[in-house]
Amino acid sequence: MGRDIPDNETWWYNPTMEVHPHWKQFNQVPDAVYYSLGIFIGICGIIGCTGNGIVIYLFTKTKSLQTPANMFIINLAFSDFTFSLVNGFPLMTISCFIKKWVFGMAACKVYGFIGGIFGLMSIMTMSMISIDRYNVIGRPMAASKKMSHRRAFLMIIFVWMWSTLWSIGPIFGWGAYVLEGVLCNCSFDYITRDSATRSNIVCMYIFAFCFPILIIFFCYFNIVMAVSNHEKEMAAMAKRLNAKELRKAQAGASAEMKLAKISIVIVTQFLLSWSPYAVVALLAQFGPIEWVTPYAAQLPVMFAKASAIHNPLIYSVSHPKFREAIAENFPWIITCCQFDEKEVEDDKDAETEIPATEQSGGESADAAQMKEMMAMMQKMQQQQAAYPPQGAYPPQGGYPPQGYPPPPAQGGYPPQGYPPPPQGYPPAQGYPPQGYPPPQGAPPQGAPPQAAPPQGVDNQAYQA
């Protein structure tokens, strides 16, 4: 690409506002680029508004979806809906077909501010969703407060305040909102290398990008580790499960795989959507600025605009009750997107067997399945820890020791139809359960019980 200022200035000349000198050094942008970009942004805007609008409609209409955890999904859909409506179609689409921004400087600032606040809100809401899922899946047994509508509302208020804080600075002179790329849209000024702009970009990079991404990485990494460890432990304990528990274990294993896959997709989607913007901004401030061409600056815009499309797909369509609501209200979407009707029915069955209640945080059936399986597994582990291990002997007070749960043996303890042994004596025939030795000094199996020693008399002296 040439570095000399071209004679034909029509591509960057704008009578309504100033254009940064950096963009004037590049040659004419072909018309095909403008038209292709306009079509792409228009499609993203229409699909983003439609998809997120459906999400908002279904989550507000369907009572079973109105849980505290799903308030984050609604907030994400609202921010993406507004992001698509204002920052995509129609303003940028019209500008692309006209081949320049025609709405003036004031509209440029409003456009940049709305894009900033709702773009950052989308990022921060995703981090809140990851925190909620981590609390439900990664720490199901923790003695922490359950998610409530009030707590979710306060977290959403924090997201709005956080996003506004980092978006309003350029309005008051800490940075600026200017034209970027092929000069058909406005965003944060990352080209100017003065102290105000540089500090604004660095702070936004740390607090508005790195901070949320660290939260997302931490939460989903621990979710994947939790489901992986849970799968190994359930495999080791599978032989002790009855038919109903085994069914739940198999359902939980399927839920684990879904959750792990969704976690990987979420992190990948986040990086693909917002990392290009961060890279270009840092490159413009600290690297060879000539590398930031109109095309290099415009690519991050396309990735960011597209995030408003796949966010509802990842966060909403993966929700079993949401798919059920789609099937009831918009059956044509099921046909169009080729959702498996059997999968929708399976989701209904899963929700029936293991319901996700508001008291449990409103998690999906997959999360509820896993939570119940982990609770069952922990209960069995507690029983094992409380009961004397093989080779140890219970006290004289009977078998099992008073207050101890029965061992996790088939049929439980005592075996069905057998009365408990006399206090202080070893079990009769059929006792103890297979694999557990009798107390030390017990008479052989089948021998009649001996008389108990008088109170205060040593047992060995009494027998002698």
Curated annotation (Swiss-Prot):
Gene Ontology CC: cell projection; membrane; plasma membrane
Residue numbers on the Cytoplasmic membrane side: 59-70, 132-151, 225-261, 316-464
Pfam families: 7tm_1, XYPPX
Extracellular compartment spans: 1-33, 98-109, 173-199, 284-293
Keywords, comma-separated and alphabetical: Cell membrane, Cell projection, Chromophore, Disulfide bond, G-protein coupled receptor, Glycoprotein, Lipoprotein, Membrane, Palmitate, Phosphoprotein, Photoreceptor protein, Receptor, Retinal protein, Sensory transduction, Transducer, Transmembrane, Transmembrane helix, Vision
Keyword hit for Repressor: no
Family that this chain belongs to: Belongs to the G-protein coupled receptor 1 family. Opsin subfamily.
Protein name: Rhodopsin
Organism: Sepia officinalis
Organism phylogeny: Eukaryota, Metazoa, Spiralia, Lophotrochozoa, Mollusca
GN (gene name): RHO
